[in-house]
Amino acid sequence: MIVDNAVIMAAGTSSRFAPLSYEKPKALIKVKEEVLIERQIKQLQASGIKEIYIVTGYMAEQFDYLKEKYGVCLIHNPFYLSRNNNSSIWVARNVIKNTYICSADNYFSINPFEKEVNDAYYAGVFTDGYTEEWCMQEDADGNIISVHVGGEKSWYMLGHTFWSERFSNKFLRILERQYDFPETADKLWEQIFIEHLDVLKMKIKKYAPSDIYEFDTLDELREFDASYKSNSRSLILKNVANRLQVFEADIMEIKTIKGNDTAAIGFEFSALGNRYSYYYESKEIMSMK
């Protein structure tokens, strides 16, 4: 089937990617000198997918330049703080047909997109060792028949998905029925998919581990792009390093601090064997000894 378009989800706050995601959306961070979402847009366009929608939410205005630069369309998700990513699917529902559903913060070392696709699929990477990711099992026809968190010697969910129009119609009908249920708000769209594997048929599209990357934290990004060790591109971390008289590379093991409303209010970090906390509003650095 011919791919109609692509929807790139870029609405979330990515609070685990502290403090860089406090300063700008994670999708707009450069990896190996290329803006994450721009790389993905260019890969889609190179594959013949010209109709591209970006679902925005957090710091939405920072994505505006993409309209003129790449001719993409922006769809705003006003529910990005109160709901999980099922709300991004919901606000884009009118354009989802034979559609790539992508996450803005994935880095593809190869171009995984094609203009013609045979079946609905979820990209997967194989692991021999144990992982906390969502592990998939398939039947003899290659259809996903179960998904569970954590496993070994398994294909796990990582990267983009392709929805056939048939899959899209079925999923969107289910989402419409369940959208206003209180328990739906916190669900990933993947959880809704998993709850209906009997009617939502999707295969595993298998990739090598070196094909798809996802960076949940600055420490993970530094493993892939070593330039971030000496230059974090973060004014906050530069200020912290200056005040503590350490190098940026000495600041590591960063963990987000959340307030009562689950919004990020700061982060913990280690530097030269000591543990500290930093709070965005007060700019205070506190020793955690």
Whereabouts are the PLM-identified features?
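Catalytic-core segments of class I nucleotidyltransferases/pyrophosphorylases
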Residues: N143-I212, D219-N239
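Conserved core of the sugar-phosphate nucleotidyltransferase
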Residues: S109-T184, K255-K289
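Conserved beta-loop-beta/alpha segment of the NTase-like Rossmann-fold superfamily
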Residues: D64-C135, A140
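N-terminal nucleotide-binding beta1-loop-alpha1 segment
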Residues: M1-Y22, G71, A271
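A short, N-terminal amphipathic alpha-helix
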Residues: E34-I54, V91
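A conserved acidic beta->alpha catalytic loop
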Residues: Y58-E61
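Short acidic/polar active-site loop segments enriched in Thr and Asp
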Residues: D4, K50, K97
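Short Lys/Arg-enriched alpha/beta "domain-start" segment
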Residues: K229-N260
